[in-house]
Amino acid sequence: EMKKRVEDLHVGATVAPSSRRDFTFDLYRALASAAPSQSIFFSPVSISMSLAMLSLGAGSSTKMQILEGLGLNLQKSSEKELHRGFQQLLQELNQPRDGFQLSLGNALFTDLVVDLQDTFVSAMKTLYLADTFPTNFRDSAGAMKQINDYVAKQTKGKIVDLLKNLDSNAVVIMVNYIFFKAKWETSFNHKGTQEQDFYVTSETVVRVPMMSREDQYHYLLDRNLSCRVVGVPYQGNATALFILPSEGKMQQVENGLSEKTLRKWLKMFKKRQLELYLPKFSIEGSYQLEKVLPSLGISNVFTSHADLSGISNHSNIQVSEMVHKAVVEVDESGTRAAAATGTIFTFRSARLNSQRLVFNRPFLMFIVDNNILFLGKVNRP
Amino acid sequence: MDKENSDVSAAPADLKISNISVQVVSAQKKLPVRRPPLPGRRLPLPGRRPPQRPIGKAKPKKQSKKKVPFWNVQNKIILFTVFLFILAVIAWTLLWLYISKTESKDAFYFAGMFRITNIEFLPEYRQKESREFLSVSRTVQQVINLVYTTSAFSKFYEQSVVADVSSNNKGGLLVHFWIVFVMPRAKGHIFCEDCVAAILKDSIQTSIINRTSVGSLQGLAVDMDSVVLNAGLRSDYSSTIGSDKGCSQYFYAEHLSLHYPLEISAASGRLMCHFKLVAIVGYLIRLSIKSIQIEADNCVTDSLTIYDSLLPIRSSILYRICEPTRTLMSFVSTNNLMLVTFKSPHIRRLSGIRAYFEVIPEQKCENTVLVKDITGFEGKISSPYYPSYYPPKCKCTWKFQTSLSTLGIALKFYNYSITKKSMKGCEHGWWEINEHMYCGSYMDHQTIFRVPSPLVHIQLQCSSRLSDKPLLAEYGSYNISQPCPVGSFRCSSGLCVPQAQRCDGVNDCFDESDELFCVSPQPACNTSSFRQHGPLICDGFRDCENGRDEQNCTQSIPCNNRTFKCGNDICFRKQNAKCDGTVDCPDGSDEEGCTCSRSSSALHRIIGGTDTLEGGWPWQVSLHFVGSAYCGASVISREWLLSAAHCFHGNRLSDPTPWTAHLGMYVQGNAKFVSPVRRIVVHEYYNSQTFDYDIALLQLSIAWPETLKQLIQPICIPPTGQRVRSGEKCWVTGWGRRHEADNKGSLVLQQAEVELIDQTLCVSTYGIITSRMLCAGIMSGKRDACKGDSGGPLSCRRKSDGKWILTGIVSWGHGSGRPNFPGVYTRVSNFVPWIHKYVPSLL
């Protein structure tokens, strides 16, 4: 059943056609090299969406940079399709589902002096369900409160304090947030969760609540990249992939990440009985994308060279900040009880070796449905 | 030493050197690279062909100048050292060459097939020398070359060979081919079977728009769904491609209702035959096997394999036969072709097959039946191609309608049962009956399944990987409000038995449900209806207050099939007299030849267990899979062990070769006797979903020696249908985990005393208990078997003679040692005839 689901995944294919550039993984590497020993967590689909939205208001080379940066080389007609694709995806993602909490949104906060083009505002609203807010950036504390309150409200309090500080010279701030919590298809047993050591490095050890469940998982050992990958399905279409690099091989795995690698993993998954040990954690990533995206070729929009004529007639406006925040909680809860009667009766043969998979050192994590919802590295749960 | 001597000693050495250096021409090329010639060392060898140039140049001058003083001791030592050195270099080079040569020869063979949709079949394709065949195979080879030479495995890709091009029932061409990869053995591990197949599948460009499975593979129109590619054997490659065809044959079956014989046998030598059968398009092939003569060893050496293709592609196997058989069995293909391979590489006695095949039309498995309003069974439904084994991926639909809304539909199966589908998949048939899901499983008795609705829609989908046993069911209507006649009891198996037979100690329902929830089984003890026979009579347990059921048990009466017959033809009522520890026959023949252990050692002593004393359980065996302890087993004879079927469930586990049996062991790893396993016999009705029939026999490759009989002893098999009394104390032993949460098994053999639990309590605890299972433990938990103990013995000591009886086999449970969840064991007394079928020497 899961195999079928895995086969049906077209990672990154539904919206963004396969690209020359690998936006998702280049962005990952850019974030990783900026903060090598820290956890990383972001939502590629959400960032792509917010950039595509921005491109609606961009012109000339600013727009080209965004589209090319996303790995798209589009004709006018297919640009329309791109936006429509995102519109559809947003509608799908925002649909309420059992045991599935996802809040994803974009908002643009512009200074009072900026007059917005009506066409842009309505396109944002209809295609991206995004709001624009006039903001008095000269009162930076007030502006920050306005932005943070908005996001907190939208995420039902799951993301508070999006901004920690705000530059009073800001004119346009783009905000992109995503919160995700879903139930596993089969829950982990609370009783099986125990404090265990997690080796942040070989010297640094922290205690983490470690969940455990023995089950049939989709599993593979990638010998090329030296890592083990296990797929744990959520209720519905999403699946979490946890990637455990062999000791000392994190860098190698990070360098090998690509859409092709991900496809290969999904294809090579085999069902296997495993004793899985996974930390219970909540991970978040908060990024000032204006500092990272220029290394991926998207730079103009954040400088005075920005052509944002589609957003406003006001000359010389630029996106001062582009804030992305992604939050995911991982715990035991699942739709189906792990210990439902009738399923927990087990044969008493011994286990074969190498059937324990313990995520007790830094690992990578994907959450995919039809797109890569999240990508991250957990250095310290 | 004088000159002559030294000359003599030098000459043969020189010969050797030149001999070798001439033989290994290529070695010299490598020599300078690996070991540069020794610079500046003077080599005073007279007049020889030098193995290396710099050495040779220096020689002649020295020799002529200083002839006599030259052969001093020092020079001789130098000479000898150099000689040794050269010899070592050459030997090393040879070794290196040998290793690199054998390494590079490590080839990987893949057998596969796919369907090309845009080329029509021509009769010429049957001729491998024809222009047409050569042309189409060249095209396919070029395409495969292109696929793999541009893939990640291009470095290792050697070639592809088209083996067969055939017609098929879906149209177009079915191409069978081999792909060969060559790589150093050290790199073999990076080679995964799935990757090779994925490369081919990835190369097929399917169009999403027209939504067919046909895509373009480098210009060929290939059906994506038809692509199969598996790792194959070198021997299969050479016998299907090579010139040595041996006993291999092609058959083209063009005539319906004709039996094409397939017979081959040999009394010595080897048989490795591939029979390729091709029928006319639109038809299928049925292979009927009359008898097979092979060595039984789980197909390790001898096998008969039936493929749903023309090449030995593993995932298209329809069936495998690993044991000799004389019962007629038949198998049906899903296409117009079939491959039958017969392998017997070392014929010791007689090996051979007697079979025939025929061309049959495809059958639709569907039917709509109007059932008459009389209640009873009136017709039959069966699996496709009954009585043949039915091929995988089949689908049947049946619709039934009764004439009255008060009548439902009843299905009576002969050796099959359908039960609600759990979260796990179905192994032997997936049933959808009026929108409810069920799984089917085979068993050794009848069952009746009732659908309380006048309109019944049934769909059966085959879920087995291989062909499955033929299935037959009788259908009829029944009264929904009263499924069983008045005065009868409805068994869990669905059968109806007279109420009077409930709780009489006789398993009338076959599933024992008529003997559960009884106050205590009561045979009719009063004179009028006293039954002279039955399990409660003369079973050693006093069931009647007046003791009547245990009277006159060994009094001679006329023989019939319910009496026990002594050696001197005297018969009496006590049926389980054989080896029960009491001499009943006047001539003592009932206790003759009972070889099992009369507990050598006095009772010494898992979860809540204690260390045993060494030698306390001489029948206990530890089964190691690829070197690590995986299950337990019990010694029942010199070469046979009894264990649990689930220990051998799965591709790798079912192969006997990775297994070793450790006998006479106390501390893990210190066995007195270790033998590889020659053969594993898993019960044919074993079902991993229902835990039923969890029993397996193992034959050792080497019988344990008589000299170890102090340390290794067989345990007794219980008499057929032996009754156990709840509360009886027995022992479970093993090297399994000592706590549920442990990760490893115990080092020292553990033992725990457990009580046999009343079957009714066992059924009410677990629900899914069958008559093949029994519960043992203590209700407070704490003492139980656990992971790693499976297959091991539940040993009970018989009071009458002090012998140890193998009452149960560790099978399953809810966790381990949890309160109110006793361990579940396979009830050995239900399998005595089955054990005797394979181990006749036990009686």
UniProtKB/Swiss-Prot annotation, chain B:
The keyword Transcription does not apply. GO terms for biological process: proteolysis. Pfam families: CUB, Ldl_recept_a, SEA, Trypsin. The active site is at 646 (charge relay system), 694 (charge relay system), 790 (charge relay system). InterPro entries: CUB_dom, LDL_receptor-like_sf, LDLR_class-A_CS, LDrepeatLR_classA_rpt, Peptidase_S1_PA, Peptidase_S1_PA_chymotrypsin, Peptidase_S1A, SEA_dom. Its EC number is 3.4.21.-. This is Transmembrane protease serine 7. It comes from Homo sapiens. The lineage of its organism: Eukaryota, Metazoa, Chordata, Craniata, Vertebrata.
